[in-house]
Amino acid sequence: MTVRRVNVVILVLLVVAFLIVLHRNLLNLNDFLNQETSDTVPGMILPFETDFLLGRKAMRSGEEIPVLITAPEERLGAAVTAMNSIYRNSKANVVFNIVTLNESVVHLSTWLSKTDLKHKIIVFDPSILLGKIPTDAQKMETVRPLTFARFYMPAFLPDAEKAIYLDDDVIVQGDIRELFNTSLKSGHVAAFSEDCDSASSKGIVRGAGNQNSYIGYLDFKKEAIKKLGMRANTCSFNPGVFVANLTEWKQQNVTSQLEFWMERNAKEDLYSKTLADCMTTPPMLIVFYKHHSNIDPMWNVRHLGATGAGNRYSAQFVKAAKLLHWNGHYKPWGRTSSFSDIWDKWYIPDPTGKFHPIRKHVEEK
């Protein structure tokens, strides 16, 4: 064989080897992309917004503290204000994972571009809820799709081992690192604040039934609930603020358990009629029945959105609270809420002018 033929053979072999390597790499890339897609269902994660903006303050270093919060269009101001209160009261490296709907991405991005908040925007796909919530028109009016985002925390935070979930109607006055460091017992997925604790019991709403026990959320006359063997007078907990061990969450298939009870309720109407508009608490009460840890009650001082909340809490107590929660009808960006001056302290005006808090003195001008 001549030298020329040998060179040709070697060249052909090199080309074949290159094509084999290229083919394998393409297969690996395809597998990677498929895995990424499955990890982020039912939403997609958009890239960091503030990390790449020039002229910003130096980003905080150290252990990341993931915080998941939702931001529906009509309440974007609530989410931004809550996040700002967290950022300003801590030096921790907090990453805000904001779940919103597709139509709110531009508005939210514009607003956040005026802040120093380190964040990711996650677009939630409401179709994931098909068959999991009642189709009754009257009930559907009170259902907000984003309220179920907390059920999918591991999908939105695939790399996090531990994270915090917060409702948007909160203000944080303490260092969020303290809440993040809440100790969870072995085998426990999450830590909540119970409704019977000394702080929240001051704000129990009169006339709202048994709002601090399981019977206020579940219909114990239904056979499916009876079979669970739960005690109706068991103290309930508030799922608007919690710390989650996401590794344990995935191992125990918590999302699947929550979806199971959502589907059962859609077919059998298992939730209590007392709080018909509360769709997220009942399945969580079932899944975490006597199997959760507790957070410090001062990290969820709630019922500030209830009638007469201003008479239930002293100014000194509210000032000492680590986290204020306006769960209830009256929100701090509305006209008749208690302690709205505290919320105003952390409010960042909407650069688009679409959102603004309602205030009496403004209306009277």
UniProtKB/Swiss-Prot annotation:
GO terms for molecular function: UDP-glycosyltransferase activity. One of its GO terms (cellular component) is membrane. It comes from Danio rerio. Glycans are attached at N102, N181, N245, N253. InterPro entries: Glyco_trans_8, Glycosyltrans_8_dom-fam, Nucleotide-diphossugar_trans. This is Glycosyltransferase 8 domain-containing protein 1. The chain crosses the membrane at residues 5-22. Its main location: membrane. It is a single-pass type II membrane protein. Its EC number is 2.4.1.-. Residues 23-365 are lumenal. Keywords: Glycoprotein, Glycosyltransferase, Membrane, Signal-anchor, Transferase, Transmembrane, Transmembrane helix. It comes from the Eukaryota. Residues 1-4 are cytoplasmic. PANTHER family: GLYCOSYLTRANSFERASE 8 DOMAIN-CONTAINING PROTEIN, GLYCOSYLTRANSFERASE 8 DOMAIN-CONTAINING PROTEIN 1. It is an enzyme of class 2 (transferase). It is found in: Membrane. Belongs to the glycosyltransferase 8 family.
